A protein has these predicted regions:
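Ankyrin repeat domain, specifically the short helix-to-loop turn at the C-terminus of the second helix
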Residues: 21-33, 61-72, 105-114, 154-163
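Cullin-RING E3 adaptor/co-adaptor recruitment helices
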Residues: 154, 168-283
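Ankyrin-repeat intra-repeat helix-capping/turn positions
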Residues: 14, 52-53, 57, 97-99, ...
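Alpha-helical recognition domains of nuclear gene-regulatory proteins
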Residues: 21-22, 47, 64, 92, ...
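Alpha-helix N-cap/N′ positions at the starts of helices
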Residues: 2-6, 85, 148, 233, ...
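Ankyrin-repeat boundary/"N-cap" motif
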Residues: 2-8, 32-51, 75-95, 117-143, ...
């Protein structure tokens, strides 16, 4: 079946009551048709992920749809109209217009595929991380409420996002870009805006650096898990040198260095391992 336009519109406007009433009116609670497309190739889950207004209602609606059997990886259909480019709900939630990562977290927890690529209908072939790093390069982000950008990058990296070949313009001869390429373009964009408040620029640059640090860390470590375990290796290395008398515990320095100093000064290995069991680089 083709989804009724008024129900898709209700999902787009985060009208939770209207969508719930329509689903409840079906013999099976809407489970048989919840993954169908409308005339433009859009599912209900995609529709409720396309905008950022009423974020709490949108997350509640997405949760309802998932409970009723919505496929988190059901992409937009190209059969009727290619303008959505086989976008997934996770691609939508990764865009810069979502001020928080609540929707992103919900879709990731439901099994959203971080490696899925669009088909280029919107002008780009990209993964959710590619879309996040590309769309954040906008005035809406620099001046808007997109302050959760590094946190979203962390969530996507934690879920296993790839770093290479994650975004390319859907034109002949274009080359795929890596996460570092996209972040470099974002940094250049920030610093090319004429007449921008220096405080705004500084804040955006800080977020860019924070995201870059995570991307570089995952690149060097080989995976998110290895990256967040890096402090453990650092502590063990410093502790071994301190124990053998080759190094004095670091004093002062950054918050990270002071944390290492605190841990290596503990004489009881049990205390050290207890601290390390709670310490993660993304906390």
């Amino acid at each position: 079946m083709v989804l009724p336009a008024e129900i898709v519109t209700a999902a787009e406007t985060a009208d939770l009551d209207a969508v719930r009433a329509w689903l409840d009116g079906k013999p099976d609670g809407g489970r048989a048709c919840i993954n169908e497309h409308d005339e433009y190739g859009c599912t209900l889950l995609i529709a409720c992920s396309l905008s950022a207004n009423h974020p709490d209602r949108r997350v509640a609606l997405a949760r309802l749809l998932l409970e009723r059997g919505a496929d988190v990886n059901r992409c937009a259909s190209d059969s009727h109209n290619d303008h959505l480019g086989r976008i997934s709900p996770l691609h939508c939630a990764s865009s810069d217009f979502f001020p928080s990562r609540d929707m992103l977290d919900l879709l990731l927890a439901a099994g959203g595929n971080v490696k899925a690529k669009t088909s280029g209908g919107a002008g780009y072939i990209e993964t959710p991380l590619g879309r996040q790093l590309r769309t954040v390069r906008s005035m809406n982000y620099v001046y808007g409420p997109g302050g959760d950008f590094p946190s979203k990058v962390a969530a996507l990296l934690r879920a296993g996002s790839e770093l290479d070949d994650i975004c390319v313009r859907a034109v002949s001869g274009a080359s795929y870009m890596s996460a570092e390429n996209l972040l470099r373009q974002f940094h250049q964009f920030i610093n090319s805006i004429p007449g921008t408040n220096p405080t705004v620029i500084a804040g955006a640059n800080e977020k860019c650096i924070e995201a870059g640090r995570m991307i570089q860390g995952v690149r060097a470590a080989g995976s998110w898990k290895a990256y967040i375990r890096r402090p453990h290796k650092d502590v063990c290395a410093v502790r071994g040198l301190v124990t053998k008398g080759f190094l004095a515990p670091p004093g002062g320095g950054s918050k990270y260095e002071r944390a290492i100093a605190f841990v290596v000064k503990q004489g009881d290995n049990g205390i050290v391992w207890k601290v390390l069991s709670y310490w993660r680089a993304d906390n």
